[in-house]
Design a protein with these regions (language model features):
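Cytosolic covalent-transfer regions centered on His/Cys nucleophiles
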Residues: 1-140
Length: 140
């Protein structure tokens, strides 16, 4: 919560420092997530909130996870599939999906949360990490 990150690269570096010691990611994850974000941007301007959903190939995921970052100020990500201007993401949700193709289902569920004004307000209004997790679970 409230990470001081100005760029996607800083978000990814902070994520690596949290995930690697806990055994969630494999060696090479940081380079892989940066490379994938450059090639396939993940910023989404949703009706209820701006989000980014970066992820990498399952080979870099040691244990499945979903990491949620609420930066202290929005972090600008390029728009997914070239769909418009860069997106100042209020929430960054890093998907650590271990099975090929598993990202699609998770992406759809997360997008549904942030298309719903009440669900998005619930998630954005949380002030603790556990609160964020609980809010996402309520609407997932």
């Amino acid at each position: 919560m409230d990470w001081e990150c100005a760029t996607p690269g800083e978000v990814f570096a902070q994520l690596e420092s949290e995930l690697a010691p806990r055994g969630y990611i494999a060696d090479g994850w940081l380079d892989a997530v940066r490379t994938r974000e450059d090639a396939y941007p993940t910023g989404l301007a949703m009706p209820a909130a701006n989000i980014a959903i970066p992820h990498t190939d399952p080979g870099f995921v040691a244990k499945p996870y979903i990491a949620v970052v609420k930066p202290s100020a929005p972090v600008t990500f390029n728009a997914m599939a070239g769909m418009g201007a860069p997106v100042p993401a209020q929430i960054v949700i890093n998907l650590g999906i271990a099975e090929p193709g598993g990202q699609v289902e998770a992406l759809q569920a997360l997008m549904n949360i942030f298309m719903d004004a009440d669900a998005a307000a619930d998630v954005l209004g949380q002030t603790t990490c556990q609160g964020m997790v609980d809010a996402i679970r309520r609407h997932f």
